[in-house]
């Protein structure tokens, strides 16, 4: 797993040596960015393939010291919230390999982060005081239709994350949705009535 760090995160980590991305599959790459939203430090953790976004606040100093472990535990917790089993989560992390901090994963990924930061400025509610995981903000950001790097079509990040899990074989493929056509009676304007 690669955890991309923007300049703001690199400064907070107090590191000068960050590796280039080694070309891991984007579904195993998460880019991170630290910014202020409504007067609080918010860490965005954004999947490079599907733009699924996790918003965290009040990062404790020890979490910065063990950054890769912290990010993995956050992703693990959010996947649990989404309904994935321990076996499925374990499979994801096993497939992702060793965790390293790298530079971000391209212009499109950074553009996605910038979009999330801009959208977060318009979030109409206050951030939860006692919660580190800002669930409502994350849900708000994951309802923004987009076409991220890992997909040819537009979609919502939360749906695209599920599709990535299906592509990896971690989640079972859902049946295609049935389309119901609404039948209306012919109208004289249709020219079908004589």
Regions found by a protein language model. Give the residues of each.
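Single conserved hydrophobic/aromatic residue that forms the stacking wall/gate
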Residues: 183-194
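Short, solvent-exposed cationic patches
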Residues: 67-90
């Amino acid at each position: 797993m690669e955890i991309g760090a923007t300049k703001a995160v690199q400064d907070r980590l107090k590191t000068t040596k960050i590796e280039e991305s080694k070309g891991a599959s984007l579904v195993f790459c998460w880019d991170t960015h630290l910014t202020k939203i409504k007067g609080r430090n918010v860490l965005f953790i954004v999947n490079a393939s599907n733009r699924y976004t996790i918003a965290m606040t009040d990062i404790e100093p020890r979490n910065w010291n063990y950054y890769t472990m912290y990010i993995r535990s956050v992703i693990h917790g959010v996947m649990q919230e989404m309904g994935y089993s321990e076996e499925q989560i374990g499979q994801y992390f096993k497939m992702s390999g060793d965790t390293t901090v790298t530079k971000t994963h391209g212009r499109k990924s950074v553009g996605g982060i910038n979009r999330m930061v801009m959208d977060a400025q318009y979030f109409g509610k206050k951030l939860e005081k006692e919660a580190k995981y800002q669930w409502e903000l994350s849900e708000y950001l994951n309802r923004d239709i987009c076409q991220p790097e890992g997909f040819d079509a537009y979609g919502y990040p939360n749906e695209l994350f599920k599709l990535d899990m299906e592509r990896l074989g971690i989640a079972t493929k859902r049946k295609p949705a049935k389309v119901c056509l609404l039948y209306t009676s012919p109208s004289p304007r249709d020219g079908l009535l004589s």
